[in-house]
Amino acid sequence: PHTIVFLGDLFKIWLAPPKFWSDLHRQVLLSFQSLKDKGCNVVFIAGNREMLLPGKFTDNWKKKLPFTHLIHNDWFLNWGNQHFGFIHGDTINYHDRQYLRWKSFSHSLAVETIFQLMPGPAARWIAERIEAMLVETNKEYKVHFPEKEIQEFAESVLPGVDNYFVGHFHVDREIKVEGCSSVLRIVPDWLSQRKLIRISAEGTKEVLHFKNSSFENAH
C-alpha cells in the first residue's frame, strides 16, 4: 500500500521505548518496519493504550519506531479527489471526566519519568495491572456510545473533509450531518471484528474482513 493509517490502541498496553517491548510487540512492530522499508507511509495516531510516546517525533525516535508519522491529535490526507481526516477519538466524549483525568495523569511528566527509570519487565507488569484495573472502572461510559458527543464532533469536522475516520469506540458506524454530504466513520476494531477499511486510488472505500487467512469484501 501507499499509506497505512493505524488509529491507535495497537496492544492492550504498549510502552513505546524498545526496552519495554515484549516479544509480541517486537513481532508486530517488525512487520510495520517492513512496510516502512518498502516505501510505505506508516502513520500511527496515538490512542489511549500507548504510553511514553515522544511529544516530538525526532530523528532519534524515527530510528526506534517503525512509523513515518507519529500523530497525537488528528491527521489529514488528500487521496484521489478526496480529503480525509483521522483521529483516535478517546477525547471526543468530554463528559467522561474520570477518563480524561486519568489520561492527563498517566501521561504526565512525573508518571512518565518514573516508568522510564524502571526495568522493562517491571514497567510492563505495572502497566498491565493498571490496564486490568481500568477495565473494571467507569463501565457506564465504556458500554454507552456517546451519540450526542459524536454528533457534535461530526458537525465540527465534516464540513472540512469528505470522510473522517474515528477509532477508539470499537463499533462499525457511519455518522452523517444534515446538509452535508461528508461522512464520519467509526472504524471497527481489529481484535474482535478483523476488519479494515481500504481506500482506492480514486478515493472510494471498501471494508475488508480478514477470514480464513485472507481478506474478503465485507459488504
Question: Which residues make up each language-model segment?
Answer:
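Active-site-proximal loop/helix segment associated with metal-binding centers of metalloenzymes
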Residues: 87-149
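A structural signal for the main folded, soluble domain(s) of proteins
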Residues: 212-214
